[in-house]
Amino acid sequence: MAVGKNKGLSKGGKKGVKKKVVDPFTRKDWYDVKAPSMFTTRQIGKTLVNRTQGTKIASEGLKGRVFEVSLADLQNDTDAERSYRKFRLIAEDVQARNVLTNFHGMDLTTDKLRSMVKKWQTLIEANVDVRTTDGYLLRVFCIGFTNKDQLSQRKTCYAQHTQVRQIRRKMVDNITSSISNSDLRVVVNKLIPDSIAKDIEKACQGIYPLHDVYIRKVKVLKKPRFELSKLLELHGDGKGSDEPGAKVSRPEAYEPPVQESV
């Protein structure tokens, strides 16, 4: 017979008694997720977080969360061209019960990418790292496909290696010129209608006709130091008055009055 303490009897409790089940959602709060002012739909959803308890602050648990939203939902549009483009927004600050987000990247859905790849054509891709005027380092990926000439009797529309290199150079030059002279707000406004890809398609017509040209992905590699005023301005809440301040005239020997108590 083994000698030892019977833990069940020493505690004086009955074996098999169930513990009181506490619903974990009673310790959580809902917060509204706000998109920047570049998008039509400002409130994109809600998120849960544990309430502030001791040293664990609720707002710190929210910062850094990434939300992936379809462009069709952000623009409140049922257009099919917007539904396959996803924008990533990262939570940077919490004001009351509102989570303020900023642009964190863009991507195409997998089904859209797979549907574009077909036989008898050349796939051309390019990527480049570009820094915006406000200090964001972005890695931009572009994709395009050669288009068959309607007058041609050939089944295929393959581009030569020299033409592929020229088209790739055009892609890099157009992306660099469009983003390097703009801040993040202007870049996002260009990504929403995909105007950069349309400019690339027009610029490459003289080399080889293209179709299905898209900015496939945008990654945010580096960000400038966080400033709350710039984030509030991005959300349309930090704009000051346009009126200049009034100049106050004081005599040269002016001294402030001495306060009796501090």
Curated annotation (Swiss-Prot):
GO MF: structural constituent of ribosome
Gene Ontology annotations for the cellular component aspect, listed alphabetically: cytosolic small ribosomal subunit
Gene Ontology process terms (BP): translation
UniProt-listed InterPro entries: Ribosomal_eS1 (IPR001593), Ribosomal_eS1_CS (IPR018281), Ribosomal_eS1_euk (IPR027500)
A family per Pfam: Ribosomal_S3Ae
Annotated compartments: Cytoplasm
Region (Disordered) residue spans: 235-262
Transmembrane segments: none
UniProtKB keywords: Cytoplasm, Ribonucleoprotein, Ribosomal protein
Compositionally biased tracts (Basic and acidic residues): 235-253
Keyword Nucleotide-binding recorded: no
Superkingdom: Eukaryota
Record bears the keyword rRNA-binding: no
Quaternary structure note: Component of the small ribosomal subunit. Mature ribosomes consist of a small (40S) and a large (60S) subunit. The 40S subunit contains about 33 different proteins and 1 molecule of RNA (18S). The 60S subunit contains about 49 different proteins and 3 molecules of RNA (28S, 5.8S and 5S).
Family: Belongs to the eukaryotic ribosomal protein eS1 family.
Protein name: Small ribosomal subunit protein eS1
